[in-house]
Amino acid sequence: MQSFYAERFEREMGCTEPEWLGWLPNAMGDVPWQRGASSAKAAIGTGSFEVQWRTGEPRRIGLATIPRMHMQFVFAGLDDAQRYTFMKRFDLYMQRGGG
């Protein structure tokens, strides 16, 4: 989790698209949202959020192969605090692993 979320940023995630789609509803929380073929859009107050994704080439580290998804996050009409509040929940639901 970060302390600041820009209006637009990109990430890589180590998951498959079916895994991502399984986690997405809980990560979105109670905000009304719609899913497209490779995107999701949400209304947050008077602003909006959109995430677009595409499958990338798997990352290979020695004999291990890790799936990779490229994500682009875009907020419109939300201030720093609103973006942080939404992404705090989103990131907690998307977080995997221990440590």
What are the functions of these language-model segments?
Residues 46-65:
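A short, structured beta-strand/loop element
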Residues 7, 38, 47-49, 67-71:
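A generic structural signal for short beta-strands and their flanking turns/coil linkers
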Residues 1-27:
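Terminal, regulation- and interaction-focused segments at domain boundaries
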